[in-house]
């Protein structure tokens, strides 16, 4: 009953307006406001500040600045093996596996189509997926899972439902309904996509090459082509791609048939850390 009420209230909320108001508050550099919000978040979400590069909350310019805090150097070691695909984020590996009949698993008993997720019928190259949920207590920066060159970025406006366990089990096609930013890369295994999925109270998605995109800033699908010679934007495995200004979800899509996950496919909701081995590229 409580779960259904939580979902019902989300249908009533003005998603974009709510998230933009949160963004204004979270960007405030008023010391009293931002310090209070940071202390409240640390207590509410049990945030481990010991891992942060900066542990003095007074040094953060705003609540958002705190939420995208950096980790201490070498805290998340990464494999140098080119055949290892690394986790792009701290969080929970909620679902992963093979894309079958153009469908991905959202939650137990719930599927959604790849075509609806990327808003394109050109889906034939993607064969595997992994979904990582970032809770408010997690590190919020997203890193490159494999060496690659940025070829395209697509912004898709949408709803801003919460993406927690309750909502993913109750709302059909959740990740295809929510706002999302899809980043395409050319890699040694072919094309991959790293998808930033927006959510309720997420005050924006940012990438290191484009900057911030506020919740539903664009009313229509937007595409940026980075494939021309004048861009040549390359990333090494482990490089920072961008971040969420609150908890949300990252989905990785990979091509080909030579990717094998490090975990048993009948398991889910596995705690994972950024740079941890996620999958192997087999011969």
Curated annotation (Swiss-Prot):
List its EC numbers: 4.1.1.65
| Pathway(s) annotated for this protein in UniProt | Phospholipid metabolism; phosphatidylethanolamine biosynthesis; phosphatidylethanolamine from CDP-diacylglycerol: step 2/2
Looking at the UniProt record, the site noted as Cleavage (non-hydrolytic) sits at: 247-248
Enzymatic class: lyase
Q: Which residues are annotated as active site?
A: 90, 143, 248
Query: Quick one: signal sequence residues?
Result: none
The cellular location(s) given in this protein's UniProt record come to: Cell membrane
Keyword annotations = Cell membrane, Decarboxylase, Lipid biosynthesis, Lipid metabolism, Lyase, Membrane, Phospholipid biosynthesis, Phospholipid metabolism, Pyruvate, Zymogen
Could you say which cofactors this protein requires? pyruvate
Q: How is the cofactor bound?
A: Binds 1 pyruvoyl group covalently per subunit.
Question: List-wise, which residues carry Pyruvic acid (Ser)?
Answer: 248
Q: Which reaction does it catalyse?
A: a 1,2-diacyl-sn-glycero-3-phospho-L-serine + H(+) = a 1,2-diacyl-sn-glycero-3-phosphoethanolamine + CO2
Q: What InterPro entries does the annotation carry?
A: PS_Dcarbxylase, PSD-B, PSD_type1_pro
Topology in the membrane? Peripheral membrane protein
**Which Gene Ontology cellular component terms are annotated?**
plasma membrane
What the entry says about post-translational processing?
Is synthesized initially as an inactive proenzyme. Formation of the active enzyme involves a self-maturation process in which the active site pyruvoyl group is generated from an internal serine residue via an autocatalytic post-translational modification. Two non-identical subunits are generated from the proenzyme in this reaction, and the pyruvate is formed at the N-terminus of the alpha chain, which is derived from the carboxyl end of the proenzyme.
The molecular function GO annotations come to: phosphatidylserine decarboxylase activity
> According to the lineage, what is the superkingdom?
Bacteria
Q: Name one GO biological process term.
A: phosphatidylethanolamine biosynthetic process
Outline what the protein does: Catalyzes the formation of phosphatidylethanolamine (PtdEtn) from phosphatidylserine (PtdSer).
Similarity comment text for this entry: Belongs to the phosphatidylserine decarboxylase family. PSD-B subfamily. Prokaryotic type I sub-subfamily.
* Subunit architecture: Heterodimer of a large membrane-associated beta subunit and a small pyruvoyl-containing alpha subunit.
Name under which the protein is recorded: Phosphatidylserine decarboxylase proenzyme
Please report the organism this UniProt entry assigns to the protein: Francisella tularensis subsp. holarctica (strain LVS)
Upper taxonomic classification of the species? Bacteria, Pseudomonadati, Pseudomonadota, Gammaproteobacteria, Thiotrichales
């Amino acid at each position: 009953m409580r779960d259904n009420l939580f979902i019902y209230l989300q249908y009533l909320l003005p998603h974009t307006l709510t998230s933009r108001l949160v963004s204004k508050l979270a960007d405030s550099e008023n010391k009293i406001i931002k310090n209070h919000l940071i202390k409240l978040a640390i207590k509410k979400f049990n945030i481990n500040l010991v891992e942060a590069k900066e542990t003095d909350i007074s040094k953060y310019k705003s609540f958002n600045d705190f939420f995208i805090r950096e980790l201490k150097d070498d805290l998340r070691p990464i494999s140098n093996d080119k055949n290892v695909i690394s986790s792009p984020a701290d969080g929970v590996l909620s679902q992963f596996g093979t894309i079958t009949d153009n469908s991905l698993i959202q939650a137990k008993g719930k599927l959604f189509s790849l075509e609806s997720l990327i808003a394109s019928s050109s889906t034939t190259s993607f064969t595997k997926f992994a979904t990582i949920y970032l809770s408010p207590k997690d590190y919020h920066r997203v890193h490159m899972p494999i060496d690659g060159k940025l070829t395209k970025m697509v912004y898709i406006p949408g709803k801003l439902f919460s993406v927690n366990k309750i909502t993913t089990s109750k709302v059909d096609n959740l990740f295809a309904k929510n706002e999302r930013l899809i980043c395409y890369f050319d890699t040694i295994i072919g094309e991959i996509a790293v998808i930033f999925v927006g959510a309720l109270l997420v005050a924006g998605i940012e990438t290191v090459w484009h900057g911030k995109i506020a919740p539903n800033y664009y009313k229509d699908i937007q595409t940026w082509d980075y494939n021309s010679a004048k861009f040549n934007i390359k990333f090494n495995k482990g490089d920072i791609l961008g971040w969420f200004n609150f908890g949300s979800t990252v989905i990785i899509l990979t091509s080909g048939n030579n990717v094998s996950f490090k975990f048993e496919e009948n398991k889910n909701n596995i705690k994972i850390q950024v740079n941890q081995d996620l999958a192997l590229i087999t011969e």
